[in-house]
């Protein structure tokens, strides 16, 4: 008896703010589209940071790339619609309370699910749902940004406004990417790290360039399986 396996997969793209997670998500979705796969991109409905002059259904990156997306706050609401697609992309995955079960269910049905998410809060504490996804994912990509204080490689997000809320959506007006040294320096001094004037100016229109780090498995090496 021959048993046919349905090749569903979960891909996780994580890292700090301004590391290019959404840009990488859109790149992969475009690539699957080029391979004649039906793709659905889902965005967090409360994230409208860059939608001032564009429809709120579009997902917009820090450097103003945009892509048509379906906005929602609970993934279960779009689960039935997702059945009609081969590939499902999810941006800001850390904010969806049901992201783990949603991704696992669809992957078990033969879908490819790609999640872009922060791996930690501004306090460097993990988002548990993202950690849970790692144990269920076939492909994991960790991205880094550029430190907006010293220009070294940055693995952490630092909040520069006064708020203890975990969910505080914003761009460079509320966050900067920092390296370990600059993050710890701020903690020791007990005040908010501020990007240099040069850093703030140079990053006002676009995010720092992406610096991939510790890529465990590159999905591009598995074209025959994914397409």
Curated annotation (Swiss-Prot):
PROSITE patterns linked: TK_CELLULAR_TYPE (PS00603)
Annotated GO biological process: DNA biosynthetic process; nucleobase-containing compound metabolic process; thymidine metabolic process
Binding positions for Zn(2+) per the UniProt entry: 147, 150, 179, 182
EC number: 2.7.1.21
Amino acids binding ATP: 15-22, 47-49, 91-94
Gene Ontology MF term list: ATP binding; calcium/calmodulin-dependent protein kinase activity; calmodulin binding; identical protein binding; metal ion binding; thymidine kinase activity
Active-site residue numbers: 92
The reaction(s) this protein catalyses: thymidine + ATP = dTMP + ADP + H(+)
Region described as Disordered: 187-227
Annotated positions binding substrate: 122, 166-170, 175
Residue ranges with Polar residues bias: 187-196
Assigned keywords, A-Z: ATP-binding, Calmodulin-binding, DNA synthesis, Kinase, Metal-binding, Nucleotide-binding, Transferase, Zinc
Superkingdom of origin organism: Eukaryota
Sequence similarity: Belongs to the thymidine kinase family.
PANTHER family, alphabetized: THYMIDINE KINASE (PTHR11441), THYMIDINE KINASE, CYTOSOLIC (PTHR11441:SF0)
Subunit text: Interacts with calmodulin in the presence of Ca(2+).
UniProt name for this protein: Thymidine kinase 1
Organism in which the protein naturally occurs: Dictyostelium discoideum
Highest classification ranks of the organism: Eukaryota, Amoebozoa, Evosea, Eumycetozoa, Dictyostelia
């Amino acid at each position: 008896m021959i048993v046919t396996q349905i090749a569903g997969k979960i891909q996780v793209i994580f890292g700090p703010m301004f590391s290019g997670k959404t840009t990488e998500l859109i790149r992969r979705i475009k690539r699957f589209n080029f391979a004649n796969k039906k793709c659905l991109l889902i965005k967090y409905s409360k994230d409208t940071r860059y939608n001032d002059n564009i429809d709120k259904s579009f997902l917009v990156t820090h450097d103003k790339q945009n892509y048509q997306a379906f906005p929602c706050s609970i993934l279960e609401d779009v689960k039935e619609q997702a059945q009609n697609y081969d590939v499902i992309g999810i941006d800001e995955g850390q904010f969806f309370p049901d992201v783990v079960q949603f991704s696992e269910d669809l992957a078990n049905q033969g879908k490819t699910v790609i999640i872009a998410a922060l791996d930690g809060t501004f306090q460097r504490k993990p988002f548990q749902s993202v950690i849970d996804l790692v144990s269920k994912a076939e492909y994991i990509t960790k991205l880094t940004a550029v430190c907006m204080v010293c220009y070294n490689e940055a693995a952490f997000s630092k909040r520069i406004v006064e708020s203890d809320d975990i969910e505080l959506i914003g761009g460079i007006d509320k966050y900067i990417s920092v390296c370990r040294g600059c993050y710890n320096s701020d903690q020791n001094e007990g005040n908010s790290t501020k990007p240099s004037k040069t850093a703030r100016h140079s990053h006002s229109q676009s995010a720092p360039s992406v610096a991939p780090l510790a890529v465990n498995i590159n999905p591009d090496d598995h074209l025959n399986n994914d397409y």
